[in-house]
Every structure is written in structure tokens, then in C-alpha cells.
């Protein structure tokens, strides 16, 4: 298979071969064929890879007491421009926003044909990209897999493609302005929202007034378009073969033509014309159901990998990290399962390991992984709402903010405002808690936020809570469900279960200590000062205390039963 792919390189004009040396000096790179069948949804796929990470550190001496560096290893990557890749889920969120117009919306996608191989190399680099084969030397003149520089270059080039397609779609919409009353009303509302947000006309056009959204992950394009009927600027219907055209189809065709003008081609077998469903990067985006979910083939593959690890009991650290990373992606469509990975991640970070950098799975780690395997084969098919990452604006009904803080030596406090009331919860650390040196400030900060959430959100009638904290570790535990310690893991597990039961959603925000004044005062025995300042704003103060099941740090220390019973609040 490797020889077949190497010969294809010459047949396609991507490289030259033969026994006559094409240049000097010349470097022959190791190469391999990578099986990407699983990643390709079970469809057989094999990719030729030039291994520019060879020689590995310490393999070949350089004669001066050091070792010969690989091509990848000698690159100064810190000097490269930073490039962030998009998430496929953003297309689902964008589709939900477009659906708010009341008009039909379609999703569509494409995949570049041999994307890397379209890009050439600088002539000064060609000598180091040769391959030795039975037919002589082959000089690979195009970008390849296995080169760190090519991966960066090609992903940055996709930014240009996305920009060009957006401009082309904007030109289409200018030539064929919408006449759908619901869309026109929606655009006017968004135009006003853009003005109130202080957006420039350019930003407003891109972020508020676009009739389409597109993102490109390397060469995988995914998009959503409003699908209204097309009229030209004079109001005449745009017809094709006796049928009036729709915007999404013209957007799709325009994107493919823009791709062609930039020297690329779309893989026809992977094109996804406008419809209610699109598959991208392991996700299914389903507009008819209003859900996003992990593709079935990928769920089954993940479950099989989990089964293998659980059965073995101990596993190489790199293999475990690979599987856990896949499950983190799966958790994007099943957030409740994120805490199930805590024990396994704890095993990864453990200082003690078996020989050969192998990791021994604890009973809790196996239990969490088994829950994931069962979920991947069952209820996870429901997925998450399209706009699950979006959050209502502060001030809308059922939406509010909880500010929390903790001091290391005094106590904790949290507050929110409901109507003309300041709801305040606070308390002091016990002597036992102060004597416990393992009870670190990050845990105290997370506890303060948790107590504020469970005590105040129900009292204020909040379904959507902006949680403000000034501690980065607590922020990470709440936002990414990535707690650092066993106590924090117990809190995250309990608060996640509570939010799911209560139908409460949380958006975590960072606030500086200076701006977190009332929570800071309350945590330092300054409740009286908070009450005095609240009175200046004509706010009545009502004290609310959480149930003991949430306040008990004994349950946190033991890691069992925290927040599990007696969740009623006391006043």
C-alpha cells in the first residue's frame, strides 16, 4: 500500500522520482502509512505520512557531544503566528441563532480534495523531503502529513479560505436581498442590538446581520444558511429549471466555486448539500430535532476502547490519555458524564506508576469508565440542544448572577439580587476546618460558589446563573468540570447532579478581587458593612443558609455523600 501511494504522488505531479539524484544534498525521510479507518467513521482510509520527527532525541550523535535534531524538533514554533481551530459545535449554535429569525434554515458542508497536496514548498526546503524506494529517490514537492510546519501552514491557509467564502456569501446576499418579512424584522432587531453593543458597522455586518455562518477546520467546511426564496434587487424571482431558487443552495454553490478559484477542489463524495442534517468532525448537527450528538460509529468505537482499558486493569499512560481525551470530546454532547472521568485523570497524574509508564486503574476509575461505556451505547444518543453553549442575557426573566468569595482564615459569602432584596448567604470556618492544612483556598472558593448556587438560585427563581469567582482553580472546576483535588471533584459531582435535577444552568465568569467587594466583605466578617451598603441602594437584606448536607466538609473529606440529602434551605 505504501508503494502504491508513493507512485500516486508522481502520477499526480506532486513529486518527481528516479535514480538520478534530483538535488544535492538530499535527505531521505522515514515514512509510514497511518490507518485512519476508525477516525473516518469506519470507512477504510490510509494516509501516507512523512516522519519529519525522526531522528528522535538522543538517537544520533552530532560529534560535538549533542544529538542530531529532527526537522520538526529544530523548528522555533514559539515564533509562529497563533492559530485557533474552530469547533464543529459552533455551527449548531449558529444555526439556532439563524432559526430565531423564523425562516427555514439549512446546514451544509464540504471537504477539500487532497488539501495538503495542493500547497507547494519553498525550493530551499525540497532537498530534505526525499523518500528512498525501489524505483529510486522520490522528491516530495508538496506539503505532507508528518511536518509540523505544514500542519500550521495549511491550517492558517484555511483562515483565508473561510474569509474568502464569507465575502463571497456577503456578495450573494447583497445581490439577492431577503424579502422574507420575518427575516427583515429579525435583522432590524439585531441591527439595534449591534448598535447598543457599540459594534462598528463592519462588526455588525459580520456578527449580527449575516444570513449565513461558515467555519473551516483545516479542509472540513461546515455551514448554516437561512433558506428563504431568492429575489434579485428589483424583486424578480430567481428561477432555475422552472423552480425558484433558495438561498442555502446558492450559498453552497458559491462556497464550492470560491474554493475552486483559490486552487482547491471539493471532494464530491464528501459534499453535503443543504439539508436538515450535517455531519462534521464526529458530530451530527440535526436541525429537525434541534440537537447535536456524537456520531453513532464514533460512539461505538469509543465504547470499545473503554471496554478494552477496563478489562486490562492497567494501561500505558499515553493510551489512557488518548481515550480520556476522546471522552472529553464526547462529554461536549453529554456534560453530565464529565465528572465520571475525574478518578481516571487522577490516576494519570499520580506520581506512582507501574513499570513502563503504565497506570493502574482504581475501582472508582473503572466505575466511571464503565458508566461512560454504557452511556455511549445508550442514552447519549439524545445529544444536547443546538445552542447549549449560549446563555441568556443578564436581566432576562430567570437569569441572574451569584457572586461568591472565601477567605483563607475567616469564612465565606455569596450574594445575589432578586427584586428589591439582597439575598445573602455566609458563614465562618470551624476550628476543625482551620486546623486542616489540606483544605486549600481553591477548595474553599469552590465551596463558597457551590453554597451560593444551591442556596440562592432557588430563592431568586433563577434557572440561568452567572457565577462569579476570583479564583482561577475554582473557575476551571466549574467551567470545564476539571477539578484539581478530590474535595473539588466531590463538589463538582454533587453540584452538577443538583443543577441537572433542578433544571439550573450555569455560566462561570472571572471577576477581580477588587470588584468582588460584597462577597469579599461577607467572607471576612463584614456582613454588617454589606447590609449598610445595601441599604444605600434601598435593598432589603435576607439571609439564606444552605442545608448542612452542602456545608459539611466532613463529607467532602470522606468523598462520600456530599450534598446527597437534606437539600432544603434554612432561613
What is the predicted function of each stretch?
Residues 214-220, 225, 233-236, 454-517, ...:
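RNase H catalytic domain
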Residues 279, 283-288, 502-560:
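C-terminal functional segments of enzyme domains
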Residues 274-390:
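C-terminal reverse transcriptase regions that engage the nucleic-acid substrate
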Residues 57-72, 118-121, 180-262, 284-293, ...:
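Catalytic palm subdomain of template-directed nucleic-acid polymerases
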Residues 135-160, 191, 244-246, 308, ...:
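A short, polar/acidic, helix/strand-boundary loop motif
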Residues 88-99, 157-163, 442-464, 492-502:
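Metal-dependent nuclease catalytic cores in nucleic-acid-processing enzymes
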Residues 1-22, 87-94, 158-170, 238-266, ...:
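Inter-domain linker/hinge segments that demarcate the starts of reverse transcriptase
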Residues 6-163, 242, 293-346:
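Catalytic-core region of right-hand nucleic acid polymerases
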